[in-house]
Amino acid sequence: MNPLDELRRRIDALDEKLVELLNERASCAMRIGDIKHQLGMEIYQPEREAEVLGHVRALGAALGGPLGGDALTRVFERIIDEARRLERESTSENKAPHDAGAGG
């Protein structure tokens, strides 16, 4: 196998792991959305999002690698956006029919 094919196979394997981890993270986000709903909390928690992004930037700096803090922040902003969407969908699906007209 030539080096290009080897690297592409490695990327495919890494992508598989990333998808598994992203789905695991998404499942956690959906459970968090349910808990927030039960506690009457807002889905959007700017302090927590800032904490996550700061943690990611710190990990990037500590671990090094070609992706700098700005790139990692952009990637995780998208991940967080999708997690927030899933939290909203999860809570709207779990509302009882009599809650649907309650205005949020």
Provide a role label for each language-model segment.
Residues M1-G104:
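Domain-level signature for soluble enzymes in the chorismate/prephenate branch of the shikimate pathway
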